[in-house]
UniProtKB/Swiss-Prot annotation:
Lineage: Eukaryota, Fungi, Dikarya, Ascomycota, Taphrinomycotina
Record's protein name: DNA-directed RNA polymerase II subunit RPB2
One GO location term (cellular component): pericentric heterochromatin
Compartments, as annotated in UniProt: Nucleus
Disulfide-bonded cysteines: none
Gene (name only): rpb2
Keywords assigned: DNA-directed RNA polymerase, Magnesium, Metal-binding, Nucleotidyltransferase, Nucleus, Transcription, Transferase, Zinc, Zinc-finger
Length: 1210
């Protein structure tokens, strides 16, 4: 077999890479990070939270009254195992049934599961009640044999997670349940609306970061760490170590530490002495590992001099205790207080237990060491925006913090109940003790409103954590499930956190971010990125101890200054002598899945550190592993080979084998062919861009001269870097750096970058089919395109976004041409004949909801057809279309302000109703009218009951929206435009074959925007329409314009897509040739019918009597400050007076000529008076804006007299 054949067979082709990507998406959905995180919460975290607070103890001390039964008792309640069942609902009559998601949506219920916990109570008696507290011996008096299962609340369930009814259900069964098989889940249903939890980005805890402070600050450098326990509360204790700047009086730069609960900064030498490291030499050893590093030792000089006075552990503790929050206590207590703070609050992530002072001292020394390295300029200060130092809190951690808070609240209530029972000698009932609605309502409140945390302290909570799931287009739904948010103030003009960072490569989409104030703060995950759910660190620590880790207690820095420090989740565990071997071993264990695949192993050779992370919220992405075993004959090639790809393809369609045995994505990971790397570990590896590049580089290493034949049309590729000797990983495909919406863009690599960002925003507003079950859903609003088409120019990624199955647009024939001038400034001309044949026609659904509410115990509202004789306050729309039950029949045509749900509420007997009420009027009208601007046909009426068993209706209305002048359209390249004119078929230009374009856009839209991909897409679509194959417009592939042109030429067309066209009016040949071809266009949701608005007269605000604002309230158009300034600059004073006064809030005021204040006037009787002046004759009439009159009267109420004096103009 010659070398050529071998090479051909072995190098992975692009096609093979896509096979691997397909296997990835077959195994996991696009909402996987949401589902994994929620499953971890339900299966592990919830039980851990219960175990953390598992015992309630109440001691009842003997009263020493000598009476019988006067003994010291201890009551204990234990929480044990928790149980979560499938989602259920309790009807108003008390029956319990299984709940399905569709039912929850339609009946406005919450899709949640009941949570039970084993509770066990125990009463113990002290053997002798005269012993001091804390030394009693307890004898069990009574104990429950069996723990009782108690209902403690309902947990909302994420759709398609392990506990959801739809989990593992086949497509045909989904149809029976009225669910769409394309729906990915990953959201909750709260009160009938779909809520998604947006991932919250935060800085990682437990990592040391060093920053340089700007010039005027008294601090030169600061090292900070925010500690949090590995699991347990989010109570973060932060600590800083500051290197003071050189000031004039004392030239030395001292180092101080900020300790929690201590008011002033403490010199670090004192902190070391308080931790029990007393001699100067020992302190220096903790900080400076190399005794010959005189520069660093010199930096420490001022610190040691500063703390020279304090030479003893107790004195150091006292020094710290004196600066604590407690004052005027005994020395004994101060020492205890300082000791407790050092034990529990200083670096709590290392441990909060007794006897670990050595570890804390070493860690403190490490922090100072890091800071001094920066100060000596041997190391760069840290980068705040490094993505490896960020964590994403998904549904799991967010719900966990909420659940922990609510569970504690509930146990406090149980404790109070227990106290009450013990005091009053009542029987203690576990079911009564637990208030189950604390957890139920707490979780529901946070998910429903997005205010994360306690309902009572809603000001301090995070807002917008949960949002209503965007159901406009299928792609917008997917994108919403993968969105992340950075909670820093939107108004801050900080540019740094918003910028794209190198470490974002492959983790978040570079194009998909909103424009405006949230730009760069709201991000979207890339297609293949994965968020770690967290795994316990104990097994790794155990393994390290077996593999020769020297603990800090035995570590002598001066003896081995070159040992590598080992950190696990930010905790310095010890040092190791052979880091290379250790790293290699850990990696091979991870590739065999002996330790979790999401653990990251970062070996920093220069700083001599090995950092391991197992925590939740790190963002990782998969990469091919390159074989780097020195003994292997395939060194420098990918571990994954053709036979693996072959096996993937074979097993893909085999349904007869068990899913566990199938060779899929998981098998690739467990066979060590692919591994997940996070942003931190990515910096320690070398990644080739594609298997071809890897192969080219390998041949270069082997000494083959690769002669490139120069093709001028070929895509320019950088030559392989001769200095790279070994690659460790290889990208699966560079197209995977994009997110959901950017993956829909054809050739995004040929566009100017902001254009891709604009399209990513507009793709969310395109009409299409958002789900296949839209007929059975009652969404508030929905737009469905009549004839959606799959695009002719597709990307490979669309396969996984189901864009072919649920597209959002149509392939229109587009000519780029100036024609008549009705397509200037981004407007487009559309062919009326195409519109009449159904191009871009869409249907619009809107749902109106109402229910009979209870008012008090007995009285309730009622659906009926209101009658004018017995009902007050009836609306002015027509009630004729209602049936007797107060609802409208499906199929009825309705227009603005018709009543579609008739409902009345009883009037209490004592209400006067502004004197309109007579004996007959017993009810008032609370009906729902159609929106004033809409019209259509009633599509569906649903009558059901809600949770309380009250009658509840939803009425869905539909109307057809036909494209018309003013509607907005866009191609997939940020080229948006509105229809400027529709021409009849006979007025449009036509080509030699008689092809008439559907859309004509202006050539001026192309040059300045540089959307070359728009033109390439048009050309490629033309080829694929002629050849009958989909055109592949995936980014970063070798498709060139030249290749497409050749194909177009072979079909007998001009190679660049130009065609001769004839003028529609005259039939003459157009002078220039016209670029003509199919382009995929999207109809956006901004329709002129929903925006058109004008007003002559209408409602005014009560307070200022100026017109109200807003189209829905029939408001006026604001004539603002800038408009006013223009009129002033033109000198049009009468126009100004008319706009701002006559047409707004003109008002007639009578003013007393003596005092200049507003007088009492009765226009009917023609009598005026000013009582303070006893004036009845001398008045002036003034016209004022009502707002000015209001201002004057408000000033009068504050004892300021605005006096209006008038002149008589003869």
């Amino acid at each position: 077999m010659s070398y050529e054949d071998y090479q051909y067979n072995e190098t992975l082709t692009q096609e093979d890479c896509w096979t691997v990507i397909s296997s990835f998406f077959e195994e996991t959905s696009l909402a996987r990070q949401q589902l994994f995180s929620f499953d971890e919460f339900v299966q592990n975290t919830m039980q851990e939270i219960v175990d953390d607070d598992s015992t309630l103890t109440l001691d009842q001390y003997a009263q020493h009254t000598g009476a019988q039964g006067d003994v010291t008792r201890r009551y204990e309640i234990n929480f044990g195992q928790i149980y979560l069942s499938r989602p259920t609902m309790t009807e108003a009559d008390g029956s319990t049934t299984t709940m399905f998601p569709q039912e929850a949506r339609l009946r406005n219920l919450t899709y949640s599961s009941p949570l039970y916990v084993d509770m066990r109570k125990k009463v113990m008696v002290a053997a002798d009640s005269n012993v001091p507290i804390g030394e009693e011996e307890w004898l069990v008096e009574e104990e429950d044999e069996e723990p009782s299962k108690v209902f403690i609340g309902k947990i909302p369930i994420m759709l398609r997670s392990t506990f959801c009814i739809l989990n593992g259900v086949s497509d045909s069964e989904l149809y029976d349940l009225n669910e769409c098989p394309y729906d990915q889940g990953g959201y909750f249903i709260i009160n009938g609306s779909e809520k998604v939890i947006i991932a919250q980005e935060r800085s990682a805890a437990n990592i040391v970061q060093v920053f340089k402070k700007a010039a005027p600050s008294p601090i030169a450098y600061v090292a900070e760490i925010r500690s949090a326990l590995e699991r347990g509360s989010r109570l973060i204790s932060s600590m800083q170590i500051k290197l003071m700047a050189r000031n004039t009086e004392n030239s030395g730069q001292t180092i101080r530490a900020t300790l929690p609960y201590i008011r002033s900064d403490i010199p670090i030498v004192i902190v070391f002495r308080a931790l029990g490291v007393v001699p100067d030499r020992d302190i220096l050893e903790h900080i400076c590992y190399d005794p010959n590093d005189f520069q660093m030792l010199e930096m420490m000089k001022p610190c040691i001099e500063e703390a020279f006075v304090i030479q003893d552990k107790d004195i150091a503790l006292d020094y710290i205790g004196k600066r604590g929050s407690t004052t005027g206590v005994t020395r004994e207590k101060r020492l205890r207080y300082a000791h407790d703070i050092l034990q529990k609050e200083l670096l709590p992530h290392i441990t909060t237990m007794e006897g670990f002072e050595t570890r804390k001292a070493f860690f403190l020394g490490y922090m100072i060491h890091r800071m001094l390295l920066c100060a000596l300029e041997r190391r760069e200060p840290d980068d705040r925006d490094h993505f490896g130092k960020k964590r994403l809190d998904l549904a799991g951690p967010l719900l966990a913090s909420l659940f922990r808070m609510l569970f504690r609240k509930m146990t406090r209530d149980v404790y109070k109940y227990m106290q009450k029972c013990v005091e009053t000698n009542r029987e203690f009932n576990l079911t009564l003790a637990v208030k189950s609605n604390i957890i139920t309502n707490g979780l529901r409140y946070s998910l429903a409103t997005g205010n994360w945390g306690d309902q009572k302290r809603s000001m301090v909570n995070r807002v917008g954590v949960s949002q209503v799931l965007n159901r406009y287009t299928f792609a917008s739904t997917l994108s919403h499930l993968r969105r992340t948010n950075t909670p820093i103030g939107r108004d801050g003009k900080l540019a740094k956190p918003r910028q794209l960072h190198n470490t974002h490569w492959g983790m978040v989409c570079p194009a998909e971010t909103p424009e405006g104030q949230a730009c760069g703060l709201v991000k979207n995950l890339s297609l293949m990125s994965y968020v770690s759910v967290g795994s316990p660190s104990a097994p790794i620590i155990e393994f390290l101890e077996e593999w020769g880790l020297e603990t800090l207690e035995d570590y002598n820095p001066s003896a081995s200054p070159n040992a590598t420090k080992v950190f696990v989740n930010g905790v310095w565990l010890g040092v190791h002598r052979d880091p290379a071997h250790l790293t290699e071993t850990l990696r091979s264990l991870r590739r065999r899945l002996d330790i979790s695949a999401e653990v990251s192993i970062v070996r920093d050779i220069r700083e001599k550190e090995l950092r391991l992370f197992t925590d939740a919220g790190r963002i990782c992405r998969p990469l091919f592993i390159v074989d780097n075993n020195p003994n292997s004959e395939r060194r420098g090639e990918l571990c994954i080979r053709k036979e693996h790809i072959q096996q993937l393809i074979e097993d893909k369609d085999r349904y007869d084998i068990d899913p566990e045995q199938r060779f899929g994505w998981t098998a690739l990971v467990s066979s060590g062919l692919i591994e997940y790397l996070d942003a931190e570990e990515e910096e320690t590896v070398m990644i080739a861009m594609s298997p071809e590049d890897l192969e080219a580089s390998r041949q270069m290493q082997a000494g083959y001269e690769v002669k490139e034949e120069l093709d001028p049309a070929q895509r320019v590729k950088p030559a392989p870097n001769p200095h790279v000797h070994a690659w460790t990983h290889c990208e699966i495909h560079p197209a995977m750096i994009l997110g959901i919406l950017a993956s829909i863009i054809p050739f995004p690599d040929h566009n100017q970058s902001p254009r891709n960002t604009y399209q990513s925003a507009m793709g969310k507003q395109a009409m299409g089919v958002y789900l296949t079950n839209y007929q059975v859903r009652m969404d508030t609003m929905a737009n469905i395109l009549y004839y959606p088409q799959k695009p002719l120019a597709t990307t490979r990624s669309m396969e996984y976004l189901k864009f072919r199955e649920l597209p959002a647009g149509q392939n229109a024939i587009v000519a780029i041409l100036c024609y008549s001038g009705y397509n200037q400034e981004d407007s487009i001309i559309m062919n009326q004949a195409s519109i009449d044949r159904g191009l871009f026609r869409s249907i619009f659904y809107r749902t109106y909801t109402d229910q009979e509410k209870k008012i008090g115990m007995t009285v309730m509202e009622e659906f009926e057809r209101p009658v004018r004789s017995t009902t007050l306050r009836m609306k002015h729309g027509t009630y004729d279309k209602l049936e007797d039950d107060g609802l409208i029949a499906p199929g009825t045509r309705v227009s603005g302000e018709d009543i579609i749900i008739g409902k009345t509420a009883p009037i209490p007997l004592d209400h006067e109703e502004l004197g309109q009420r007579t004996q007959l009027h017993a009810k008032r009208d609370v009906s729902t009218p159609l929106r004033s601007t809409e019209s259509g046909i009633v599509d569906q009426v649903m009558v059901t009951t809600n949770q309380e068993g009250l009658k509840f209706v939803k009425v869905r209305m539909r109307s057809t929206r036909i494209p018309q002048i003013g509607d907005k359209f866009a191609s997939r390249h940020g080229q948006k435009g509105t229809i400027g004119m529709t021409y009849r078929h006979e007025d449009m230009p036509f080509s030699a074959q008689g092809i008439v374009p559907d859309i004509i856009i202006n050539p001026h839209a192309i040059p300045s925007r540089m959307t070359v991909a728009h033109l390439v897409e048009c050309q490629l679509s033309k080829v694929s329409a002629l050849s009958g194959f989909e055109g592949d417009a995936t980014p970063f592939t070798d498709v060139t314009v030249e290749a497409v042109s050749k194909l177009l030429r072979s079909h007998g067309f001009q190679s660049r897509g130009f065609e001769v066209m004839y003028h529609g009016h005259t039939g003459r040949k157009l002078v220039a040739q016209v670029f003509l071809g199919p382009t995929y266009y999207q109809r956006l949701k901004h329709l002129v019918d929903d925006k058109i608005h004008a007003r002559a007269r209408g409602p005014v605000q009560i307070l200022t009597r100026q017109p109200v604002e807003g189209r829905s309230r029939d408001g006026g158009l604001r004539f603002g400050e800038m408009e006013r300034d223009c009129q002033i600059s033109h000198g049009c004073s009468s126009v100004l007076r008319e706009r701002l006064f006559d047409c707004s809030d003109a008002y007639r005021v009578i003013v007393c000529d003596i005092c200049g204040l507003i007088a009492i006037a009765s226009y009917k009787k023609d009598s005026y008076e000013c009582r303070s002046c006893q004036n009845r004759t001398r008045f002036s009439q003034v016209y004022l804006p009502y707002a000015a009159k209001l201002l004057f009267q408000e000033l009068m109420s504050m004892n300021i007299a605005p006096r209006l004096f008038t002149k008589n103009h003869k």
